């Protein structure tokens, strides 16, 4: 993620380093000013030449000017540092917000994955149940087909037996009819013979 206004972690580090260095310079300058003041006090106590006093005074003025310039630079660096810290805070909050959003999205994705996995498991279980039911039905159908085949064999055997019985019955009927015809012919022949004898007896008288 880019840092706004071109600031980076390395930039913030350099600002802090410059800030510390400026503080060291200011402390050194303040120490030097303190020493110069002590020298001036000693000069008041001990008479010195005008040239030496002017040189010391000039040096003191230069140090004060440098000190003031350093303070201005320090103030600018402090302003930059505060601005950088503010940006870091904003970025930290934004990062935390994005982190929470990411964790929420990740949690949602995980939840959906678990739901889909659960649905998948349920579908697999349902398919297994259906497959098991189909296998059972096929076993039942195979059993029924075997029963039907056995019944067909029994029926075929019964039909054959029936046909055999019918054939025997027809033969018996034919035999009975033949016997009846023979008996009828014999009966007719016997009747004819009796009638012939009955016609012959009166003539003999």
From Swiss-Prot:
GO biological process, one term: spermatogenesis
InterPro entries associated with the record: SPATA24
Pfam families: SPATA24
Keyword Iron-sulfur listed: no
UniProt region (Disordered), positions on chain: 180-205
Keywords noted in UniProt: Coiled coil, Cytoplasm, Developmental protein, Differentiation, DNA-binding, Nucleus, Spermatogenesis, Transcription, Transcription regulation
Subcellular location: Cytoplasm; Nucleus, Nucleolus; Nucleus, Nucleoplasm
Highest taxon of the lineage: Eukaryota
Annotated region (Required for interaction with CBX5 and TBPL1), positions in chain: 138-185
Basic residues bias locations: 186-205
Recorded GO CC terms: cytoplasm; nucleolus; nucleoplasm
Coiled-coil boundaries: 17-166
UniProt GO molecular function: DNA binding
Family label: Belongs to the SPATA24 family.
Protein task: Binds DNA with high affinity but does not bind to TATA boxes. Synergises with GMNN and TBP in activation of TATA box-containing promoters and with GMNN and TBPL1 in activation of the NF1 TATA-less promoter. May play a role in cytoplasm movement and removal during spermiogenesis.
Quaternary data: Homodimer. Interacts with CBX3, CBX5, GMNN, GTF2B, TBPL1 and the polycomb proteins PHCF2, RNF2 and SCMH1 but not with CBX1 or PCGF2.
Protein name: Spermatogenesis-associated protein 24
Lineage of the organism: Eukaryota, Metazoa, Chordata, Craniata, Vertebrata
Gene (UniProt): SPATA24
């Amino acid at each position: 993620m880019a840092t706004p206004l071109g600031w980076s972690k390395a930039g913030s580090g350099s600002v802090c380093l410059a800030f510390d260095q400026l503080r060291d310079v200011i402390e050194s300058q303040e120490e030097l000013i303190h020493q110069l003041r002590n020298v001036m006090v000693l000069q008041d106590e001990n008479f010195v030449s005008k040239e030496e006093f002017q040189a010391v005074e000039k040096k003191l003025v230069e140090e004060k000017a440098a000190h003031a310039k350093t303070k201005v630079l320090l103030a600018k660096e402090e302003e930059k540092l505060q601005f950088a810290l503010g940006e870091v805070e904003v970025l930290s909050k934004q990062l935390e917000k994005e982190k929470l959003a990411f964790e929420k999205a990740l949690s949602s994705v995980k939840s959906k994955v678990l739901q889909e996995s659960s649905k998948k498991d349920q579908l697999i279980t349902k398919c297994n149940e259906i497959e098991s039911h189909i296998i059972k039905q096929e076993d039942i159908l195979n059993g029924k087909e075997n029963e039907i085949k056995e019944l067909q064999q029994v029926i075929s055997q019964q039909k054959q037996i029936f046909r055999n019985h019918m054939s025997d019955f027809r033969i018996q009927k034919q035999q009975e009819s033949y016997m009846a015809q023979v008996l009828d012919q014999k009966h007719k022949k016997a009747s004819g013979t009796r009638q012939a004898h009955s016609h012959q007896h009166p003539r003999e008288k």
